Structures are given as structure tokens and as C-alpha cells.
Amino acid sequence: MIISELQSDGRGQYGRRWISEKGNLFVSLFYVKNNLYLTLKQLTNINSFLVKKLLARYYKKKINFKKPNDLLIKKKKICGILQETIDKLDKKYLIVGIGINLIKSPNINNYPTTNLYDLIKKKISKKKVEMDLKQIFENKFKSLINKKK
């Protein structure tokens, strides 16, 4: 798991520019894809489910998934998830990039955004969210991909 404080050259789906605000959470998870026998769509569903599970620890109301890769609260984007595969040295890797708006809402044209702080009126330790995300993915990802086979 790689964590970034700030992204200066991030990108979103279809190569769009990814806007990142300092104080929010930006994480990349890496998996050897040779060991994963799921479609990208199945992996998208699993990763969205796990991030939604994380957010539900802090926000107790409805969280929606908007295809292909966003999580919304009150019709506003709180999280984006980008997945891609790369080939290196005869191995395929899955990279899952996750951006969660913890304390700031990026300004995206014609796309309302929100952040966890504005929703719950309480600052949450970014370190705690990082550790919770790591714990959820370590404990649940493997069991979920094995169920899908």
C-alpha cells in the first residue's frame, strides 16, 4: 500500500486529470494479477464494496456506488477508485488507486463533491482511516476474490 500526501500529476478514468486536495487520502494498492481470475468488472465491484465498508465506519447513512468508479453521498462524490493493469517482467499487476475526500471537496466542473468532515462535522485522523483501509483490504479482499471463482 502506497500513501501519498499530495498528487501533482494524478489522473482519473479515461486519462482525465485527477484533482487532489492536501489533507485527503490517496492510496494505491498493488496485487499480482496472475493470481487473480476475476474480470475487471468483478474487481471493481469488490473494491467499491470494500471502500464503501470503510466509509460506513464513519458515515452511518446511505452511500451509493456510481458506475464506473465513484462513491457518492447525498449525490455528491466522496471517493474515486481507479483500477488498471500493468505488465512488468512477465507478470501482470493490478493497481487500485483510491482517493477519499476526508477534509476538502475538490472543485470538479459539473460534478458536486463532498468530504467526510463536512458530513459528520468531526475531524477523523487520516492515519486511522489509512489503517482501517489497510485492515479491511487485508482481511476481506482475499476472501472475496476466492468467493467469486
Predicted region positions:
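Short, histidine-centered active-site or binding-site loop motifs used for metal coordination
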Residues: 6, 31-33, 120
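DPxDG-like acidic metal-binding loop motif
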Residues: 13-35, 43-44
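Gly/Ser/Thr-rich helix-start
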Residues: 11-16, 24, 81, 98-100
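Long, positively charged amphipathic alpha-helical accessory segments at protein N-termini or as interdomain linkers
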Residues: 35-36, 41-63, 73-149
